[in-house]
From Swiss-Prot:
GO terms for cellular component: axon; basal part of cell; bicellular tight junction; neurofilament; plasma membrane; tight junction. Interacts with tetraspanin-3/TSPAN3. Interacts with OCLN. The modification Phosphoserine is found at residues 193-194, 197-198. This is Claudin-11. Residues 1, 104-122, 179-207 are cytoplasmic. The lineage of its organism: Eukaryota, Metazoa, Chordata, Craniata, Vertebrata. The gene is Cldn11. Disulfide bonds: none annotated. InterPro entries: Claudin, Claudin11, Claudin_CS, PMP22/EMP/MP20/Claudin. GO terms for biological process: axon ensheathment; bicellular tight junction assembly; calcium-independent cell-cell adhesion via plasma membrane cell-adhesion molecules; cell adhesion; spermatogenesis; tight junction assembly. Residues 23-82, 144-157 are extracellular. It holds the Pfam family PMP22_Claudin.
Amino acid sequence: MVATCLQVVGFVTSFVGWIGIIVTTSTNDWVVTCSYTIPTCRKMDELGSKGLWADCVMATGLHHCKPLVDILILPGYAQACRALMIAASVLGLPGILLLLTVLPCIRMGHEPGVAKYRRAQLAGVLLILLALCAIVATIWFPVCAHREITIVSFGYSLYAGWIGAVMCLVGGCVIVCCSGDAQSFGENRFYYSSGSSSPTHAKSAHV
């Protein structure tokens, strides 16, 4: 029962974290830039934000972004962070799908518990790799960007990335280390049997 709960917790945590990674990858509010104080920059229309895909200027009621499409002049750290975040987003899809198939409520024929166990371990490893890619990118980008521009604060995209990466890391570690062994995956399967008096639910143990 404990292993089953940990599997569900690992799946939910990882799924929410993966959504956060996708939000971070697709948005541009990574760092807020300003050469003066924020109120002064707002008055002078010089408050901006920088992300993987665009540089934006935020004025009162306006939000103008300039896409970063010229790869030749794009800094190396920005290209590397793009690659890391795209890899993290892509790795999350097979990881979540594999994790979905090993949940106790999902049954794929009469497969042995060891098959579910191996898929769970693979899903956990993918989620951990996803988290490491996101952590490196979300730390590397603001550090390198600070050398080029004046950063006054972090944007919501960066916070979403940090939270998502930590959740995926925790979820992956729970799946790999704490969700039981191959035997527990075989035992956590339920079938429906109707008796002569009333319907009952029974657990089937597979060796």
